[in-house]
A protein has these predicted regions:
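Short, solvent-exposed loop/turn segments at secondary-structure junctions
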Residues: 8-10, 36-37, 84-85, 108-111, ...
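Structural element of the ATP-grasp superfamily
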Residues: 44, 69, 153-157
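GT-A fold catalytic core of metal-dependent nucleotide-sugar glycosyltransferases
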Residues: 53, 60-117, 125-126
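N-terminal anchoring/stem segment of glycosyltransferases
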Residues: 1-58, 161, 194-206
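Short, high-confidence coil segments that cap the C-terminus of an alpha-helix
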Residues: 26, 74, 98-101, 163, ...
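Short, solvent-exposed loop/turn segments at the edges of secondary structure
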Residues: 118-119, 186
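Catalytic core and acceptor-binding pocket of nucleotide-sugar-dependent glycosyltransferases
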Residues: 126-205
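Hydrophobic/aromatic beta-strand patches that form the interior of the parallel beta-sheet core
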Residues: 3, 30-32, 52, 78-80, ...
Length: 206
């Protein structure tokens, strides 16, 4: 199943996300409720296959994301951030997943700007419950100084463990906004409108 989630502060994106998902995808969509309004909840219930309630867990904000991945009942799961624009059929992404690994696209803009290899957590695929997923959840609970779930995951990996725990997905499954600035001209199945400028771009499409 595909999995996404958000809280009330991001639910304005949901009609746009769901429309793109329904246009291109046939696989079930599971939603993790991080704290939606009643209106947001109604939109979700009408359009997804199952809803998971994560409103009462101790994790805050995007740190609920790894936990929602762990709790998703599907054997094969692909998390997609709500600021991702699905532009093509992506159902075949499930054929690329490997046991005991998180399947992710390299975050080339961050790799370029931060000096070591990063992977973007906007699209994360996995089979069953990989050990690294449990480690990611534990690290987010202990997190005090990292700014997001992607940074926490990067911190618990080194170049060697990255090879054994992360499977590289083709770039087309998660093309970052900054890649367009950097001259990317390859295929785009998922366009990831990151950051404030990305949100402004999404608003312009509503």
């Amino acid at each position: 199943a595909f999995l996404t989630g958000c809280d009330e502060g991001h639910e304005w994106i949901l009609p746009w996300f769901i429309k793109n998902y329904k246009k291109h995808c046939k696989k079930p969509l599971v939603f993790a409720d991080f704290g939606l309004s009643d209106i947001g909840r109604a939109i979700v219930r009408e359009n997804v296959h199952a809803v998971m309630d994560l409103t009462k867990v101790e994790e805050r904000g995007w740190f609920k994301k790894p936990l929602s991945m762990y709790k998703c009942p599907a054997k094969k799961t692909v998390w997609i951030d709500t600021d991702c624009e699905i532009k093509d059929n992506i159902d075949d992404i499930f054929n690329l997943l490997e046991p005991q690994k998180l399947s992710m696209v390299e975050d080339k803009p961050w790799t370029k700007r931060r000096g070591h290899r990063w992977h973007n957590s906007g699209v994360v695929g996995f089979i069953d419950k990989p050990t690294i997923l449990g480690q990611w959840i534990t690290a987010t609970k202990n997190n005090v100084d990292q700014v997001g779930d992607q940074e926490v995951l990067d911190k618990i990996l080194n170049p060697i463990t990255k090879i054994s725990k992360i499977k590289d997905l083709p770039n087309e499954y998660n093309v970052m906004r900054l890649q367009l600035t950097d001259g990317y001209n390859g295929r785009i199945r998922i366009m990831h409108w990151t950051g404030q400028k990305g949100k402004e771009k999404i608003r312009s499409m509503l």
